[in-house]
Design a protein with these regions (language model features):
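Positively charged, low-complexity intrinsically disordered leader regions
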Residues: 1-60
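Active-site cofactor/substrate anionic-group-binding motifs, chiefly glycine-
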Residues: 46, 51-92, 96-99
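A glycine-rich helix N-cap at a beta->alpha junction
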Residues: 100-110
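Active-site-adjacent beta->alpha loops and helix N-cap segments on the catalytic face
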Residues: 111-119
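A short helix->loop->beta-strand "cap" motif at the edges of active sites that frequently abuts
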Residues: 123
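Glycine/small-residue-rich loop that forms an oxyanion/phosphate-binding "nest" at active or ligand-binding sites
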Residues: 126-127
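Conserved small/polar residues in nucleotide/adenosyl-binding loops
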Residues: 131-133
């Protein structure tokens, strides 16, 4: 699978070779995660964190990994203060957030929400929800 520019919405997208490829890349990146090596490969890139339900470890781990590779993180985990509260649709939110991000990680409790968001997004979306898309 060519992951470049692709949404990752479900484990069902992956076959065995895709999983092997992901583990290989993770192995290559390990020295950066334990700070034995430094890279700025993601310098200038922006990760949009979009969490519609509580998260500590997942939200922080994605942000930390992106930072360790030189990228910046835009937190949007305070959904209660977003325009969604005023009635903005998840589609409009996707269009706006994706214009300010290079990739978006998202957790949403409602089935179908991440898929709808990804369809409106201009950038890849990674589903971090515990439910199926």
């Amino acid at each position: 699978m060519d992951f470049n520019g692709s949404h990752i919405l479900s484990i069902d997208q992956f076959d065995r070779s895709d999983i092997d490829q992901l583990f290989s890349v993770a192995n290559d990146l390990e020295p950066y995660s334990i700070r034995k090596k430094i890279t700025r490969v993601l310098e200038g890139a922006i990760l949009g964190n979009m969490f519609f339900e509580p998260s500590t470890r997942t939200r922080i781990s994605f942000g930390a990994a992106f930072n360790m590779l030189g990228g910046a993180v835009r937190e949007t985990s305070q959904v209660g203060s977003s325009s969604l509260v005023k009635g903005e649709s998840i589609i409009d939110t996707a269009k706006v957030l994706s214009s300010y991000s290079d990739i978006i990680v998202m957790r949403h409790p409602d089935e179908g929400s991440v898929k709808s968001f990804s369809e409106a997004s201009r950038v890849p979306v990674i589903n971090l929800s515990l439910i199926h898309i």
